Regions:
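Residue-level signal for the "D+5" position in two-component response regulator receiver
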Residues: 42, 69-70
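Two-component/phosphorelay signaling modules centered on CheY-like receiver
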Residues: 23-41, 116
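Acidic, metal-coordinating helix/loop segments flanking the phosphotransfer/catalytic sites
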Residues: 44-60
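Alpha4 helix (beta4-alpha4-beta5 surface) of REC/receiver domains from two-component response regulators
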Residues: 74, 101-123
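Non-catalytic signal-transmission and effector/linker regions of two-component phosphorelay proteins
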Residues: 1-23, 27-30, 127-153
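A short, hydrophobic beta-strand element within the central beta-sheet of small alpha/beta folds
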Residues: 86-107
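Short amphipathic alpha-helix used as the core "switch/output" element in two-component signaling
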Residues: 73-91
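Active-site residues of response regulator receiver
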Residues: 63-66
Length: 153
């Protein structure tokens, strides 16, 4: 006789990497997205972001475009190489913090960032829209995860 036991995972459901040189900005972003279901790693430069990306998987990346040591573009490029090397089917949503006008006014930069997997842009002074964008991206990711799975009986 087998037990019909449902194992409910404990601990955080979503892992975030927040890479920004400002302690204050990282704190604001953490405050906007932190729940019991999130685990958040904060770093202050691009090299530290790459170290964390090599250590483990993240569900959402929040990157400052002009990070010190390695900028956000370099971080995204190297992250893409890591994903390709691992042949990972999971590509976490990425949000870039920058001056919105800087990106919106530069079609080439916008296209390049999107080709690297950037899903959204937020002004470098994060606002409540950050939480809404993160929620939308997580819902889209969850939908991608469930596509192709057999329906529960």
């Amino acid at each position: 006789m087998t037990d019909n036991v449902v194992h409910i995972p404990t601990g955080p459901r979503w892992r975030f990497l927040i890479a920004h040189q400002s302690d204050a900005v990282r704190h604001v972003i953490r405050t906007l997205v932190e729940t019991e279901q999130t685990s958040i790693v904060e770093v202050a430069d691009g090299e530290a972001a790459l170290v964390e990306l090599e250590r483990g998987r993240f569900d959402v990346l929040v990157l400052q475009l002009d990070l010190p040591l390695k900028d956000g573009i370099s971080v995204m490029q190297l992250h893409r190489l890591l994903l390709a090397h691992e042949r990972s089917p999971v590509d976490p949503p990425a949000i870039v913090l920058t001056l919105a006008a800087e990106v919106r006014g530069n079609v080439t930069l916008t296209d390049h960032l999107q080709s690297l997997g950037v899903d959204g842009f937020i002004d470098d002074a994060p606002m409540p829209q950050t939480a809404a964008l993160v929620e939308t991206l997580l819902q889209a990711r969850e939908a991608r995860r469930t596509i192709g799975k057999p329906a529960a009986a």
